[in-house]
Amino acid sequence: MKKALAWTLTLLVTTCLWAQNTSPEPIFPIVQGFGGIFDAPHATEKPDPTLEYKVVIDVATGDQNKSEPFMSLINLARLINLHAMGGVPKENIHVVAVMHKDAMWAVLSQEAYRKKFGVDNPHIPLFQELKRHGVKLFVCSQSLYKREVPFEQVMPEVEVATSMLTTMTTYQLKGYAALKF
């Protein structure tokens, strides 16, 4: 009897511990399929839904795995989704991203990306979804020149900027908060 009770208690405790450790499913309040986040009902520090959020992001980091979207670019979607989860209306979230250094490879057209890396460009659906939600996407022309990438190889969702430096300073002077990914 004691053995059966001990096994039952062990099973019950193990099941309860397992249930506590399972993660909830990510949610996608605005940007669908990218930048999944977890509801944080217990958070005490939250975005102010009455503010207009203007953010310019210096995106420099790429990843080794060229068949998956770069985490730095997934974070663009996370930023938007987190603010939305915090109650900020979509029309009060303004995001500008300028890619350079290793992140600039993400902006290649399907054909150019496949030729360079041997796989389809996984960033195209992400950029299409970001553009659909008003994100302005730029690539630094200086990074393109330095890596000898013709402007014609940039996907249509991304515009060419004079440079990351001038884009960052211009938007900061327009009141955008600066982040670096």
Sequence positions of predicted segments:
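Acidic helix-start/capping segments at beta-turn-to-alpha-helix junctions
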Residues: 89-107
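A cross-taxonomic marker for long C-terminal extensions/tails that follow the last structured domain
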Residues: 20, 27, 113-114, 119-181
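Histidine-anchored nucleotide/phosphate-binding helix
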Residues: 69-88
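Solvent-exposed, acidic/flexible segments
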Residues: 65-72, 120, 161
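Structural recognition of the beta-strand scaffold that forms the well-ordered cores
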Residues: 54-58, 95-99, 136-139, 180
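Acidic/histidine-rich, surface-exposed loop or edge segments in extracytoplasmic proteins
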Residues: 48-66, 108-111
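Bacterial Sec-dependent N-terminal signal peptides
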Residues: 1-21
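Long, contiguous juxta-domain segments that are non-catalytic but functionally important
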Residues: 20-41
